[in-house]
Amino acid sequence: MKLPVAVQLYSVRDEMEKDFYGTIQKMKDLGYDGVEFAGLFGEEPSKIKDFCAEIGIIPISAHVPYYDMLENPEKVLSDYAEIGCKYVVVPYLTEECRPGTDGFAATVEGIRKIGEAAKALGLQLLYHNHDFEFVTIDGEYALDVLYSTVPSDLLKTEIDTCWVNVAGVNPAEYVEKYSGRSPVVHLKDFKKSGDKLGKLYDLIGIDDDAQEEEEEDSFSFMPVGYGVQDIPAILAACENAGAEWVVVEQDSPAKNDTPLNSVKLSREYLKTLNW
């Protein structure tokens, strides 16, 4: 059974800031079934809920900064519960929180606490990976350590298939590894030249001093179906794993493209696969 397709609104964040509701309407017009938020831009949760219901698009989830959720989870998460989101997501870890640092153990415990707060509000916490979670701890990927430490009812996966591939792991196989624990999967495509990938996090709008120096044009995010990812295999893995949603995300457009056209091309490609 084909799964519904949502879009991570970070992909069109500048458009969201300029015209919040108009941009969500455009996502509906492009054929997206749902949206995943990346900020509410000062809009009222009740109004967002009503608008989504009116146009027939589902607010499935939201990326919420880790520290915001950790410091005041009930207040921060209640907005998304009011909107009607089923999921909230840890989207990214700053350098001091990551595996390989002294802060990682505290981060794992913090994620557990957020998961408990989310559960109390009727929300399910997910974790959205990058590539830095694929360092090993005692022979095991740090991402697997996170999932084996925090119980499944408090934390499920939001596997970003681009970053899994960048880390050198087969994304379809990794999605299936977490069958029954992968309700939402990020579809993201890319192309690269050479082995040195440059400052990848600049491309997602984050300044990260831990990155390598940039090699021009070595890496580019692409619309889904326009890069190196085996999208049909990933989609089949999502179905096999029992996923509920796939989410298109493109952190930055390819050269000479625009964010709106990027998400349009991604949706059109998925339609050619009858998704």
Enumerate the language-model features and the residues they cover.
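Acidic-and-aromatic substrate-binding clefts and catalytic sites of carbohydrate-active enzymes
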Residues: R13-K18, G34-K47, V64-N72, E95-P99, ...
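Active-site acidic/histidine proton-transfer and metal-coordination neighborhood
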Residues: Y66-T157, K177, L260
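N-terminal pre-domain/capping segments
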Residues: M1-Y87, K156, D217, A236, ...
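C-terminal/domain-terminus segments
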Residues: A243-L273
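Generic structural signal for well-ordered alpha-helices
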Residues: I24, P45-K49, P73-L77, V108-G115, ...
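Conserved beta-strand positions in the central sheet of alpha/beta enzyme cores
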Residues: E36, S61, V89, L126, ...
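Acidic/histidine-rich catalytic cores of soluble enzymes
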Residues: A120-V228
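Tryptophan-centric aromatic hotspots in well-structured domains and transmembrane helices
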Residues: Y10-V12, Y32, H63, Y127-H128, ...
